[in-house]
Amino acid sequence: MTRYKATISYDGYAFAGFQRQSHARSVQEEIEKTLTRLNKGQTITVHGAGRTDSGVHALGQVIHFDLPYQMDEEKLRFALDTQSPEDIDVISIELVADDFHCRYAKHSKTYEFILDRGRPKNPMRRHYATHFPYPLDVERMQIAIKKLEGTHDFTGFTASGTSVEDKVRTITEASLIVDETGQFLTFTFSGNGFLYKQIRNMVGTLLKIGNNRMPVEQIDLILEKKDRQLAGPTAAPNGLYLKEIRYEE
């Protein structure tokens, strides 16, 4: 068997997430269907580095899969790209070692969350940015977001029901910028891994702080008490993008 690593992007609007679902459309299933066709009907299993939720987009998701033969990488990329649905793009494909695993190989991820605070709301952006038409103190949010950097137990920012026991993660970058029009805010988070709905919960909390409904110090309290009830609501998925995955050499 020959193992390939691929970088893909997708519009998450019409997907129930990356991971295969029993009764809903998923990115994993669509790519597996295309690869199976290319492999003359023999089933190919795809593994993903991250499991994006329903409605979440990806600019640089990484997958790997095995084929029973070796094929020119660009020809394989072109075939997979052109035969996959329009809301999936295959950016690159490369041959990797047989023991490479996109999920377990040491890597870091970068996510972006796009917020649209324009009024009136632009319906053309509704699937690709989360609308928030309320007042925001950006400076307060920029102070608060820096408190998330470093190694912490992020239990207080995790959705209930997660089976992960170790909730300690390291965030190497947490930043917030505003575009020149003042309409769009981009939250950026980079780290060695993120918990279930962690980023959306952090953004929801930062919006509460920016709206003066929580103090800046609320971040410290959530990290200290590890209590989800102290954090803000979960932000909508449509503004979230898996931007990049970087592997250590």
Swiss-Prot record:
GO terms for molecular function: RNA binding; tRNA pseudouridine(38-40) synthase activity. Its EC number is 5.4.99.12. Substrate binds at residue 111. Keywords: Isomerase, tRNA processing. It comes from the Bacteria. It catalyses: uridine(38/39/40) in tRNA = pseudouridine(38/39/40) in tRNA. It is an enzyme of class 5 (isomerase). InterPro entries: PsdUridine_synth_cat_dom_sf (IPR020103), PsdUridine_synth_TruA (IPR001406), PsdUridine_synth_TruA_a/b_dom (IPR020097), PsdUridine_synth_TruA_C (IPR020095), TruA/RsuA/RluB/E/F_N (IPR020094). Gene3D superfamilies: Pseudouridine synthase I, catalytic domain, C-terminal subdomain, Pseudouridine synthase I, catalytic domain, N-terminal subdomain. The keyword Isomerase applies. It holds the Pfam family PseudoU_synth_1. The keyword tRNA processing applies. GO terms for biological process: tRNA pseudouridine synthesis. The active site is at 53 (nucleophile). HAMAP family: TruA. Belongs to the tRNA pseudouridine synthase TruA family. Homodimer. PANTHER family: PSEUDOURIDYLATE SYNTHASE, TRNA PSEUDOURIDINE SYNTHASE-LIKE 1. Formation of pseudouridine at positions 38, 39 and 40 in the anticodon stem and loop of transfer RNAs. This is tRNA pseudouridine synthase A. It comes from Streptococcus pneumoniae serotype 19F (strain G54).
